[in-house]
Amino acid sequence: MCGIVGAVAQRDVAEILVQGLRRLEYRGYDSAGVAVVDSDKQLTRLRRLGKVQELADAVEAAQVAGGTGIAHTRWATHGEPSEINAHPHISGDITVVHNGIIENHEMLRTMLQDRGYVFTSQTDTEVIAHLVEWELRSASSLLEAVQTTVKQLTGAYGTVVMDRNDPSRLVVARSGSPIVIGFGIGENFLASDQLALLNVTRRFMYLEEGDVAEMTRRDVRVFDALGQPVQREISESNLEHDAADKGHYRHYMQKEIFEQPKALINTMEGRITHDCVVVESIGVHAAEILAKVEHVQIVACGTSYNAGMTARYWFESLAGVSCDVEIASEFRYRKFVTRPNSLLITLSQSGETADTLAALRLAKEKGYMAAMTICNVAGSSLVRESDFAFMTRAGTEIGVASTKAFTTQLVTLLMLVTALGKQQQRIGRELEAEIVHALHQLPKQIETALSFEKQIETLAEDFADKHHTLFLGRGEYYPIAVEASLKLKEISYIHAEAYAAGELKHGPLALIDADMPVVVVAPSNELLEKLKSNIEEVRARGGLLYVFADEVAGFEADETMKIIAMPHVSEIVAPIYYTIPMQLLSYHVALIKGTDVDQPRNLAKAVTVE
């Protein structure tokens, strides 16, 4: 959720650190700070509440110099957003930044206070700084002091430690919060996300759970949780250097909405032919595993959970395999029964979602036949810890409100469903060809849906002064309605809820009045007539109806109901297609309201703490 950047170089690194923080702004934060030490052991620390730009201005004004440094953007967990609580934190000659939550910080704080340490902040991070300072008194090196310190910590952390008396190195530890090391020429870097470092290196190494690493200009040494030296794989990043550039778009979210046709094409490339799904593209042993699957368990959070809810309909109606979908933070604390030959699927854009990772680790102890992840970040923790990964190829998604990651997850899930049904001979060649044809057509159809932006922009004016909105859908369009309500509440701060339309009379009808917009997802399918009855229930109570309807569905607009006629598409991919106007609606409502579209208040892109 927070962002970390570190560097050891011959050149001044303050600008590199601040630029790295800029590239991590999408993760969400409330304050930022930087600390740099020079060859004369002079330490400069600057912290600011608010945007990274305020920190950048302070760094420029102070003319910060030095070749070793760490920087951080904070998203408050312990202690209010303030300059005092902002990182880095200092204890004597030790400076620390930290992502995560130290669960036993109160006990450690009491112990350290008994030793005479005075705390200046409300954060859990400050206990790390004091602990390292204490351990360094008897340790032979900073590395040893950090190794001893992390053994005393309970919780999640990605933490970097700098010693003013030894400006040639940084020591970093990782448990439950991602850290990547970037390799330069005569200089090395680290960050919580490789995106922060793409302007200085393309060669990266991800630390594993429990790793502690010592980084100098010329060398990186990694030790596992037992203190044994280990080698971790170094790989070349294929992320685009300009991924953090908005181009001509006003916001990252708008850019990412319009990148969806290309993202879907990239996600399908090499995985479908003109008439079939290439099962081998899912994984080396995918054909063998999918042939044995009797049950699918999907675990995810937020938007990824909504993608899983949509896929449940496909697994059961197309592939004939039972499927359960559960929120990761609930799944991991529930006593559950693992069904025979059950495949676990985790969904995550970042691959670092704390609850989803914890659910995966729990599930691996519970007898699932295999653990698969659908993820957008190669090298992430979910990818490394799963048995196999089916990657989305959405490209870097910076807007906090997920758009292209969601639709590429849906396309990936539909390809997986087709492969599973094919391997179990429940999807024949004719149906497989129909699904694949629909997938091939989808990018062009989404381009058509994007052309509705002006119409939806006008429609958005009706929502901007409302306090509540209700979304309705039936069948596989109910999760699409849920996702639409999530988008609206995330970025416009309008309270929005979604219901299966058949549930209206079981409570939500009590909310309907002339100030409650009701948005309906209305494709032409076997539930259309029942959906029309639900719409009439809203109409009879004076509700404001906005119906996104298939052009062949037979709706007619009047003073109580506005119709957005959507071109007819294959029923198989229609849930993906109807997502697009919902994204545009949320975006333009937020735009009218003047909210921070890309960085909504209180939210972060990657939720790496529980």
From Swiss-Prot:
Query: What does the record give as the active site?
Result: C2 (nucleophile), K605 (for fru-6p isomerization activity)
Which key words are in the record? Answer: Aminotransferase, Cytoplasm, Glutamine amidotransferase, Repeat, Transferase
All copies of the SIS domain together span 286-426, 459-600
| Gene Ontology MF terms in the entry | carbohydrate derivative binding; glutamine-fructose-6-phosphate transaminase (isomerizing) activity
Q: In the Enzyme Commission scheme, what number(s) does this protein have?
A: 2.6.1.16
Enumerate the Gene3D superfamilies for this protein: Glucose-6-phosphate isomerase like protein, domain 1, Glutamine Phosphoribosylpyrophosphate, subunit 1, domain 1
Cite the Pfam families for this sequence: GATase_6, SIS
* Enzymatic class: transferase
What biological-process GO terms show up in the record?
carbohydrate metabolic process; fructose 6-phosphate metabolic process; protein N-linked glycosylation; UDP-N-acetylglucosamine metabolic process
Q: Does the keyword Lyase apply?
A: no
The record ties this protein, via InterPro entries, to:
GATase_2_dom, GFAT, GFAT_N, GlmS/AgaS_SIS, GlmS/FrlB_SIS, Ntn_hydrolases_N, SIS_dom, SIS_dom_sf
Could you confirm whether the keyword Repeat appears in this record?
A: yes
What range(s) does the Glutamine amidotransferase type-2 domain occupy? 2-218
The principal localisation class reads: cytoplasm
A GO CC annotation given for this chain: cytosol
* UniProt superkingdom: Bacteria
Oligomer and partners: Homodimer.
By what name is this protein known?
Glutamine--fructose-6-phosphate aminotransferase [isomerizing]
- Annotated organism of origin: Vibrio cholerae serotype O1 (strain ATCC 39315 / El Tor Inaba N16961)
